């Protein structure tokens, strides 16, 4: 995968790399917008958000740390996660394809 400079960065909390379209999920009302392979981008997660992890290729949250809900559940599902990525909801465009690197803690745009 070829990539450019990170769009956002944060705490690497679940290792691996995944590519997919950004899905901005701000409230439970947005849950139905998630599709398999989407990159879940949100402020934070709690147990009510757990079903979304089955669909997500990766998770990016604006808050949290290594022991946050998003980090723990992402590791359980073995999907990459970057938490504490300040500004992710405003910097990442809904539907834009990104590469999430949960080992480095970066989210980059994809080049052709």
Enumerate the language-model features and the residues they cover:
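Non-catalytic, soluble scaffold/interaction modules
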Residues: 1-112
């Amino acid at each position: 995968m070829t990539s450019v400079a990170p769009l956002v960065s944060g705490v690497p909390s679940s290792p691996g790399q995944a590519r997919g379209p950004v899905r901005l999920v701000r409230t439970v009302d947005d849950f139905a917008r998630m599709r398999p392979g989407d990159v879940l981008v949100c402020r934070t997660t709690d147990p009510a958000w757990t079903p979304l992890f089955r669909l997500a290729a990766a998770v990016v949250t604006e808050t949290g740390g290594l022991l946050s809900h998003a980090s723990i559940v992402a590791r359980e599902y073995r999907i990459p996660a970057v938490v504490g990525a300040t500004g992710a909801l405003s910097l990442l465009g809904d539907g834009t394809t990104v590469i999430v690197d949960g080992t480095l803690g970066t989210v980059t745009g994809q080049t052709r």
